[in-house]
């Protein structure tokens, strides 16, 4: 489920404070990585912005249904700061969402901030209505609801949903799901042979907006079109970026406005 929007009384003032420096930091990382193609392009309906991990989950001594779990107000204050930034950066076109992951590691809860390009996200739900319809999702469903359900779904449905919503081609999503099913069924857990199609970002040419394809597969016009469109957006970003670089860091909010 999503992080609650209401706050305890001693945290409510923190929630309402918007930290521009934190917003610049989040956006700077986003623009330098694959979220550029959500923030300044329509290639990716959603992208990762920031990974967080805090000691707020149950530890091994706690039981299901316990009322008093998280005592770390300082950690919750940090989360509320990120929530305030998400709220401040969201508008009619983009939505920033903080989603807690289902799995925990001891008492550590992992969370992720995502940015959604709402119209493109809705189009993707419509395109794959036969898949997303099983939860009653339509193009009008709030992305926050979609992600809160998908994150807690079964493994393969979760993987397929994220594959579509991160903007990977249908054939790549099919391959990823089926190849991992085969690997799971194999007693030796042997990885199915594959190649990778990498789309460059400012931070590097590989390992960010990247998807797997069958070993024998040759990239087609769809892959080439994605690459060319991304390259055009990245070139524009590279040209503008230096003008917004200051000794204190990248003035990412102003740069993002210029890129829109």
Regions found by a protein language model. Name each.
Residues 3-4:
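C-terminal motif of bacterial Sec signal peptides marking the signal peptidase cleavage site
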Residues 165-167:
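Conserved phosphate/anionic-ligand binding catalytic regions in large, soluble enzymes, centered on
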């Amino acid at each position: 489920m999503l992080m609650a929007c209401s706050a305890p009384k001693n945290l409510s003032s923190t929630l309402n404070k918007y930290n521009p420096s934190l917003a610049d930091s989040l956006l700077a990382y986003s623009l330098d990585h694959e979220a550029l193609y959500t923030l300044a392009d329509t290639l990716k309906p959603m992208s990762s912005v920031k990974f967080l991990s805090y000691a707020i989950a149950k530890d091994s001594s706690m039981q299901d249904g316990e009322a008093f779990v998280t005592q770390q107000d300082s950690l919750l204050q940090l989360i509320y700061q990120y929530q305030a930034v998400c709220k401040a950066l969201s508008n009619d076109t983009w939505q920033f969402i903080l989603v807690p992951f289902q799995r925990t590691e001891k008492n550590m809860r992992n969370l992720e901030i995502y940015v959604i390009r709402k119209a493109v996200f809705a189009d993707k739900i419509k395109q794959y209505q036969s898949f997303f319809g099983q939860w009653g999702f339509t193009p009008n469903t709030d992305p926050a609801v979609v992600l809160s359900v998908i994150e807690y779904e079964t493994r393969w449905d979760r993987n397929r949903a994220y594959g579509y919503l991160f903007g990977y081609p249908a054939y790549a999503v099919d391959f990823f799901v089926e190849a991992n099913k085969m690997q799971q069924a194999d007693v030796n857990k042997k990885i199915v042979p594959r190649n990778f199609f990498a789309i460059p970002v400012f931070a590097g040419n590989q390992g960010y907006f990247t998807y797997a394809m069958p070993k024998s597969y040759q990239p087609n016009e769809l892959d080439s079109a994605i690459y060319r469109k991304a390259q055009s957006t990245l070139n524009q970003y590279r040209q503008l970026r230096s003008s917004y670089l200051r000794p204190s860091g990248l003035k990412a909010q102003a740069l993002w406005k210029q890129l829109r």
